[in-house]
Amino acid sequence: MSIRAQSRTYEHLDSARCDTKLKTMNILDKIITDKKREVELKKNIIPVSQLEASVLFNSRTYSLSKLLKNSVSGIIAEHKRRSPSKSVINNNHSVEDVVLGYQNAGVCGISVLTDAKYFGGSLDDLLLAKASVNIPLLRKEFIVNEYQILEAKAYGADVILLIAAVLTRKEIKQLSEFAQSLGLEVLLEVHNLEELEKSIMPSLDMIGVNNRNLKTFEVSLNYSKELASKIPDEFVKVSESGISSIEAV
């Protein structure tokens, strides 16, 4: 066998190994793998200094936690174009129309999906939302790096989401403290008791229970019911996902 032929064989085997690894990964693993790669690429294109020079970087932020505490509705609405579980959700209405409709309906805040590959969102969606409403905006993203928090601040977010399932306790502490140093609030998302217990710390403002299992995308409101009493009262408690009717509320 020639050296070239051997090289091709090894390349084919490496490719096969990668394909096998991807097939065994759940959707959350795939998203995080892609997200880490995406962040590194963006850091090479847009330096931190450019984000910090944004017009919105030093702008006033709104407190979602305070509004939730004093609200009649207690609702955080969401702008989402699509998802891995439901394909296309909103392909016809502009960001401006959607978020204005939410604000006029009396919601406390709006969650804006900014992941492009899996949810069809973008930071431009967050920017358009900022220009359209004057209520708190949550950047809903798979945050794994401080750079993404700087992006959130530069594009008009008031709140960031941290997902306990993809972060260690040390990472949650580092990222949440960094966000608060920029004047951003932090919503920490958990799905089970183990994630909750590893995550409780002073640098969080809100703790949410995701009713959707991010590894399988199965939904059950029982997750919120079971964990709500375990969340300390010092944190605003949020039930996330799977709420699609008045009865669910």
What are these regions (language model features)?
Residues 1-2, 6-12, 16-19:
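A cross-taxon signal for low-complexity, glycine/charged-rich
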Residues 31, 77, 102, 152, ...:
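Conserved, mostly hydrophobic/aromatic
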Residues 62, 120-138, 142, 173-188, ...:
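Alpha-helix-loop-beta-strand connector modules within alpha/beta enzyme cores
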Residues 79-94, 136-144, 187-189, 238-239, ...:
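Active-site mouth loops of central-metabolism enzymes
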Residues 201-249:
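Active-site/ligand-binding-proximal alpha/beta "capping" segment
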